[in-house]
Amino acid sequence: MRIDVVSIFPEYLAPLELSLIGKARQDGLLELNVHDLRTFTTDKHRTVDDTPYGGGAGMVMKPEPWAQALESVAAARENSKPVLIVPSPAGEKFNQALAYELAEEEQLVFACGRYEGIDERVIDWAQDHFRVRPVSLGDYVLNGGEVAVLAMVEAIGRLLPGVVGNPESLVEESHSDGLLEYPVYTKPSAWRDHDVPPILLSGNHGKIAQWRRHEQFRRTAERRPDLMEGLDAGVLSRADRQALADLGYDVVDGRLRAKPGGDTEN
C-alpha cells in the first residue's frame, strides 16, 4: 500500500517512523510519503490561508496550493483514482470496519486541514481525481487533521499483511467482532490483594474461551451499550444468549435489545 499525507506541519507525522508502522516502512510493506503543502505555494511568504468570504472568525486554506499538491500525489499512480481522506468533524465516523475497508486500497491520500478548514471547492474539484471521503474520529474538534491522520494510519496500517507479527491478535482485539476485548492478565497470579480469575489458571481452554466471550459481552454492555444493538444475533450460541439474558438483553427480530424495564449492567 502507498499512503501520502499532505500537511503544513510534516514534522507532526514523525511518529509514523516508529514502532510497527515504522518497521513496516523499512520492510517495504508500506510506502508512506509526507508532503509539505507550503512547497506548492508560489509567493515568497508561502501563504496557504486567507480570510473567509462572507466574514467570520479564522482563516480558510487556499484552494490552489491544495490542487497543486493533490495533482502531484495523484500523478504517482496513473490510471487509478486513489481514495482522498479529509479529516473533518463533518465527516463519516472512523471505526474498525472502515479501517478494514481502507486497508484493501492500493493508495490512500490524507489531506490535513488547519484553521477553519480547506476551501470547499477543493473537495468538489477533487471528486474528478479521487474518491473523496471526509472522515471524523469522533464528535469533537482538533486543531488540525494531523492527529486524526496519525490514528487512522496506524489503525489501517496494522491491518496490512505482515505488519502485526501474530495475525490472531487482530481477530481477538476490541471492535474486530463488534465487541470490546476481554480483560487480560499476566504474572504474578496474585498481586496486591488482586488475583487473576481462577478460570484462566485452570488449563481448560474451552471454558477459558467461554469466559472471555462472556467478559466481552459484560464489558461492552457496561462501557459501550450502543454497540450491543449492532450485534448479529444469528451467530450467537445458546451459551451466548444465556449470558446476554443475564445482562438484561433479549433477541428481537435478529437483534439484541435491552429488556423493557430491565436493568442492563451499564
Swiss-Prot record:
Pfam families: tRNA_m1G_MT (PF01746). Keywords: Cytoplasm, Methyltransferase, S-adenosyl-L-methionine, Transferase, tRNA processing. Belongs to the RNA methyltransferase TrmD family. This is tRNA (guanine-N(1)-)-methyltransferase. Homodimer. GO terms for cellular component: cytosol. One of its GO terms (biological process) is tRNA N1-guanine methylation. It comes from the Bacteria. S-adenosyl-L-methionine binds at G113, L137, G138, D139, Y140, V141, L142. Its EC number is 2.1.1.228. It is found in: Cytoplasm. It comes from Paenarthrobacter aurescens (strain TC1). Gene3D superfamilies: 3.40.1280.10, tRNA(m1g37)methyltransferase, domain 2. It catalyses: guanosine(37) in tRNA + S-adenosyl-L-methionine = N(1)-methylguanosine(37) in tRNA + S-adenosyl-L-homocysteine + H(+). It is an enzyme of class 2 (transferase). One of its GO terms (molecular function) is tRNA (guanine(37)-N1)-methyltransferase activity. HAMAP family: TrmD (MF_00605). Specifically methylates guanosine-37 in various tRNAs. The keyword Methyltransferase applies. PANTHER family: TRNA (GUANINE-N(1)-)-METHYLTRANSFERASE.
